[in-house]
């Protein structure tokens, strides 16, 4: 059951990221944010299930992303996250659960960067409109 749910959640996150990239091309920021949140929620659920499956395994320092560059771009970051999730799905289907967990964890890091970007943008907009 857990394995089935992990695969469903990863697949759903991939699909939501696809929607977010389409919305980005259409310059529909609200839809980008909504889709990224949905992808993140599904990914967090998958990671929770991974943690239940492998309680003795903790994400290691080698799973962390390199420090972000000064120039952040949403599009390439979403593509990177989606690529990692596709790799996670492939690894999962090949029953390489450790690698699937690692790739999903790394994709999470990219999605957190996107969330941080939009949060900073909202704060900046809030200060300029006050």
Language model features with spans:
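Long, charged/polar, soluble alpha-helical segments
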Residues: 1-130
């Amino acid at each position: 059951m857990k394995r089935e749910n992990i695969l469903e959640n990863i697949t759903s996150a991939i699909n939501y990221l696809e929607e977010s990239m389409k919305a980005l091309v259409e310059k529909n920021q609200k839809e980008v944010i909504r889709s990224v949140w949905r992808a993140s929620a599904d990914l967090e659920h998958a990671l929770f299930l991974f943690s239940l499956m492998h309680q003795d395994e903790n994400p290691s320092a080698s799973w962390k992303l390199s420090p972000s560059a000064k120039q952040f771009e949403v599009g390439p970051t979403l593509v990177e996250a989606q690529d990692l999730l596709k790799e996670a799905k492939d690894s999962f289907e090949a029953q390489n659960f450790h690698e699937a967990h690692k790739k999903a964890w790394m994709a999470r890091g990219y999605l957190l960067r996107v969330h941080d970007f939009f949060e900073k943008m909202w704060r900046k907009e809030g200060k300029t409109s006050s």
